[in-house]
Amino acid sequence: MKPFRCNPEKNDALKDARGLSFESVVVAVESGGLLDIVNHPNQAKYPKQRVLVVAIENYAYLVPFVDEEDHYFLKTVIPSRKATRDHLHKGESDVNT
């Protein structure tokens, strides 16, 4: 697998805003937390991006990235209730329905 890279300023902003860093994403991926890789839902605006779906502490995060020639460039980290439901809580009944 290619190495991961990111913008250090964006990494600091993520730590401050979400308490999560790109380093924690990489550790999760390397320890088996990669749940899926999907195309970015807005291919018209982000044609070269794909999205990692990564489990971190029993919650799914979406991590848009660009597949460069010699590395993967991580763009941001987005917590996702839908991805958590779809990838981590399959088959569990929803108490609200």
Regions found by a protein language model. Name each.
Residues 1-97:
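Ribonuclease/tRNase effector modules and their secretory precursors
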